[in-house]
């Protein structure tokens, strides 16, 4: 009984319909419906960003339950869309962007334009050293004469001096600044040298001073010699002033 009932149950048309309804027809499993194909191709031209979800939904709607492989088949079947072909037609865009990122300072290495001839910077921010100004002998003589008159110049004076010497105002200003700094250094060095020489002279005078003359010796025993010597060194000014005795005699007479 069991052997005969099993084939009958398998060969029954109801069971076959259930199996085919569960898995679907083989043609629909292998390729999506033509309606979903047309819908995907038309929608891909308008909105490329939403083409893949619409294709997945349209292909999955023809089945009893959603499967993973119809989405893959729909994408692979429409690989020749205009959007994908346009992306694949520019393979060098990524390399071009990478080369630009690797070399960001190619355009910034150019030096900037000089403004006023005072400050110049290149693309990296480093200051470019300007060429040193070479003054002629006549210009140096005129500048030195003016520096002896005054160490600071007003704007009109500086402009006039620069025009007369054929220089710019910036060159004249820088020359006066350098000259003032050198002059201050020389003054400091000269003051230190004068102080050192004064100290050296004081030490030499204290070490090599002459001895005290014998007339000024307080321990001398001879009064005449000391008096004579004292008279020779200190003149007597008693004749210029009246003595105390004469003043005392004149006071009662005035009374």
Swiss-Prot record:
The family database entries (SMART domains) matched by this protein are listed as: HOX
**Annotated CDD domains:** homeodomain
UniProt GO BP? cell differentiation; cellular response to BMP stimulus; cellular response to transforming growth factor beta stimulus; cerebral cortex GABAergic interneuron fate commitment; embryonic skeletal system development; hippocampus development; negative regulation of BMP signaling pathway; negative regulation of cellular response to transforming growth factor beta stimulus
Leader sequence segment:
none
> Per its UniProt record, what InterPro entries does this chain match?
Distal-less_Homeobox_TF, HD, HD_metazoa, Homeobox_CS, Homeodomain-like_sf, HTH_motif
Entry GO terms, CC: chromatin; cytosol; intracellular membrane-bounded organelle; nucleoplasm; nucleus
Spell out the Low complexity composition-biased ranges: 25-36
Gene Ontology molecular function: chromatin binding; DNA-binding transcription factor activity, RNA polymerase II-specific; RNA polymerase II cis-regulatory region sequence-specific DNA binding; sequence-specific double-stranded DNA binding
**A Pfam family of this chain:** Homeodomain
Q: Which UniProt keywords apply?
A: Activator, Developmental protein, Differentiation, DNA-binding, Homeobox, Nucleus, Repressor, Transcription, Transcription regulation
Paired cysteines (S-S):
none
UniProt free text on domains = The homeobox DNA-binding domain is necessary for its nuclear localization, transcriptional and erythroid differentiation activities.
On subunit structure and binding partners, the annotation says: Interacts with SMAD4 (via homeobox DNA-binding domain). Interacts (via homeobox DNA-binding domain) with POU4F2; this interaction suppresses DLX1-mediated transcriptional activity in postnatal retina and enhances retinal ganglion cell (RGC) differentiation.
What family does the database annotate?
Belongs to the distal-less homeobox family.
Q: This protein is called what? A: Homeobox protein DLX-1
* Species assigned in the record: Homo sapiens
